[in-house]
Amino acid sequence: MLRMTPLASAIVALLLGIEAYAAEETFDTHFMIGGMKDQQVANIRLDDNQPLPGQYDIDIYVNKQWRGKYEIIVKDNPQETCLSREVIKRLGINSDNFASGKQCLTFEQLVQGGSYTWDIGVFRLDFSVPQAWVEELESGYVPPENWERGINAFYTSYYLSQYYSDYKASGNNKSTYVRFNSGLNLLGWQLHSDASFSKTNNNPGVWKSNTLYLERGFAQLLGTLRVGDMYTSSDIFDSVRFRGVRLFRDMQMLPNSKQNFTPRVQGIAQSNALVTIEQNGFVVYQKEVPPGPFAITDLQLAGGGADLDVSVKEADGSVTTYLVPYAAVPNMLQPGVSKYDLAAGRSHIEGASKQSDFVQAGYQYGFNNLLTLYGGSMVANNYYAFTLGAGWNTRIGAISVDATKSHSKQDNGDVFDGQSYQIAYNKFVSQTSTRFGLAAWRYSSRDYRTFNDHVWANNKDNYRRDENDVYDIADYYQNDFGRKNSFSANMSQSLPEGWGSVSLSTLWRDYWGRSGSSKDYQLSYSNNLRRISYTLAASQAYDENHHEEKRFNIFISIPFDWGDDVSTPRRQIYMSNSTTFDDQGFASNNTGLSGTVGSRDQFNYGVNLSHQHQGNETTAGANLTWNAPVATVNGSYSQSSTYRQAGASVSGGIVAWSGGVNLANRLSETFAVMNAPGIKDAYVNGQKYRTTNRNGVVIYDGMTPYRENHLMLDVSQSDSEAELRGNRKIAAPYRGAVVLVNFDTDQRKPWFIKALRADGQSLTFGYEVNDIHGHNIGVVGQGSQLFIRTNEVPPSVNVAIDKQQGLSCTITFGKEIDESRNYICQ
């Protein structure tokens, strides 16, 4: 495979400076370019802006948009190099106006008056084609024909945590949580599993399987097929956990402008706290966080739009709980774009002994720039529901209105017929930078039943509490059944430059058959004063018993720098302070220091000192996170006069593939196995703690499905003798794919040899160095220094002295090469 190495590039640049002689010289390409073994290329003009003949793996760009990686064979006359009509079609270039008899078109022909340029150093070919002849793509979007299925592999992403607290007044408390997100990818199919284990104190631990399904994406349908245990969509009906089959349009296969929103969970921890997020009765996220504001944006939710129950357990044992609504305004689709979702199976609701078979279908269609219609049906034994709705894209924002009719007949013969109506609103006012997001109001009549209501009504005498859960799924029937009105909204406003931003969110609910209502309001203001950032936050909550809770928080963060990034690395340490007030006045204060250290920024640390007004208690704490190449390890400790608290966790990933078993410090749903044989300690995409192992392999997660993912290796901190030939690659995987990205390397041992001719003169710069078989293994550099690469020490090498007269000399070695010695070429 033809490859230009960094050293060869430098040598070529030097050779071009001797244009009068070198332009007509003959050079072997094996060493300088790294391919084409045993081939000689004659009369190559090195000053021409053309690649040498051979086969290349090239990233092709059309009008600066990546269109995929292709094998191109450059002919002896580069002007005759051509591409087939099939490749041209995949590039998105219209070839209808070309002569029908031509099946392979030269570059000059296909650019149709435009231009093309090579950049062999990074294996890139750019075509500039008149826009009228190009199928335009949204920035970052990749056509389906360039999506990669990936390789066969087994993987698991794990998280293990242990939390311990010891209170003088009440004794100790222990909790264990383990979660595995695993997958088996085989022949383009993917088996996904999400399982967890929870244990508190002396209660027996409980294993739960949240999801287990087989999946495959289909580019022709722009959709995904799943079979197994999973959740239905929440776009039209409430999400239902079930066992069966589901076929749906994967909106991420479409350009970015048609993507869905994802929830964001945020709050403020007063100490080293344990944040637990539950959905549908399953713990979907648990993490220890240091004192101060936290924001969780990497949730992997299987349950669609079910609300999130969040609990923050502080070091002193106090627990704050709140609800994060998870509902979205139905997508306003582009004209002619549709979204479908079909599901059939049997409900698999946790804790319910009586389940029900059902079929669900949903469909959305964008008629024009103003109107999107949608509808759906849910049919089961003794239950049905139908929904019709419309979304309008108006000048005052996106508005959707829908109505649902339900019929439920319970096992005891009771019949309930009801209706539910919803109005949702979403708007961004660009002139004022105001965003109204997910403002939604829903009213349900007394006898309206969701499918979850229907199933739980038939199980209301059988459910039991799971002591391992903060909010058990059984609490659904007691707390959420019979919802009457529900209103949620959030607004954010960017103020004029220098004035910061403000956000407001609210949630209000009431229920049939219950007096009172629950209300929750949150208001925050954030800004920066030079380098100092601060946030003012206020919240007010009312429960159904008219109990009111108010909180006000002031958070300040100040960065301090040291190091000049030359003699010492530049570092930052942050000093923060968080003060909270409640109905009684001052409640707590926390002061902390945090930062990052390590040669590869692999350690994050924090220390804090907090004081609680209640009990007049002062607590000291510390936390440390180690981002190792093979795992992420975290530990925390807090102590006061009345309690001690400690927590530890380890997370990471294990990947088994044909090249072996590799460890990663984290693993997401879609990831890459980057393979650079012989290159050790090279880091990926600027993440210095994520490095290649001794075999040159590193796992890189965070790949975006169906999009360009740029992968780069940095060898500046690597002392490997192997040479990396091109450090950048691009991949566009299917969702859930494990993509193998191979980097070309030269693992032959490098030698630097000092040598002179027998008459004491220097050898000619730029001449080849050949082994005893006549194969090129190196070149003469400046100062009569030879650079060669070999798998083993050669008995001797030959160097040309005068090519026109065919004169050469030989350097003889012993069993080893002494790089400190001056050799004589005789």
Swiss-Prot record:
<dbReference type="InterPro" id="IPR025949">
    <property type="entry name" value="PapC-like_C"/>
</dbReference>
<keyword id="KW-0812">Transmembrane</keyword>
<dbReference type="InterPro" id="IPR025885">
    <property type="entry name" value="PapC_N"/>
</dbReference>
<dbReference type="GO" id="GO:0009279">
    <property type="term" value="C:cell outer membrane"/>
</dbReference>
<dbReference type="Pfam" id="PF00577">
    <property type="entry name" value="Usher"/>
</dbReference>
<comment type="function">
    <text>Part of the yehABCD fimbrial operon. Could contribute to adhesion to various surfaces in specific environmental niches. Probably involved in the export and assembly of fimbrial subunits across the outer membrane.</text>
</comment>
<keyword id="KW-0998">Cell outer membrane</keyword>
<feature type="disulfide bond">
    <location>
        <begin position="809"/>
        <end position="825"/>
    </location>
</feature>
<keyword id="KW-1134">Transmembrane beta strand</keyword>
<keyword id="KW-0472">Membrane</keyword>
<feature type="signal peptide">
    <location>
        <begin position="1"/>
        <end position="22"/>
    </location>
</feature>
<keyword id="KW-1015">Disulfide bond</keyword>
<dbReference type="Pfam" id="PF13953">
    <property type="entry name" value="PapC_C"/>
</dbReference>
<dbReference type="GO" id="GO:0009297">
    <property type="term" value="P:pilus assembly"/>
</dbReference>
<dbReference type="InterPro" id="IPR037224">
    <property type="entry name" value="PapC_N_sf"/>
</dbReference>
<dbReference type="InterPro" id="IPR042186">
    <property type="entry name" value="FimD_plug_dom"/>
</dbReference>
<protein>
    <recommendedName>
        <fullName>Outer membrane usher protein YehB</fullName>
    </recommendedName>
</protein>
<dbReference type="Pfam" id="PF13954">
    <property type="entry name" value="PapC_N"/>
</dbReference>
<dbReference type="InterPro" id="IPR000015">
    <property type="entry name" value="Fimb_usher"/>
</dbReference>
<dbReference type="InterPro" id="IPR043142">
    <property type="entry name" value="PapC-like_C_sf"/>
</dbReference>
<dbReference type="GO" id="GO:0006974">
    <property type="term" value="P:DNA damage response"/>
</dbReference>
<keyword id="KW-0732">Signal</keyword>
<keyword id="KW-1029">Fimbrium biogenesis</keyword>
<keyword id="KW-0813">Transport</keyword>
<dbReference type="GO" id="GO:0015473">
    <property type="term" value="F:fimbrial usher porin activity"/>
</dbReference>
<comment type="similarity">
    <text>Belongs to the fimbrial export usher family.</text>
</comment>
<dbReference type="InterPro" id="IPR018030">
    <property type="entry name" value="Fimbrial_membr_usher_CS"/>
</dbReference>
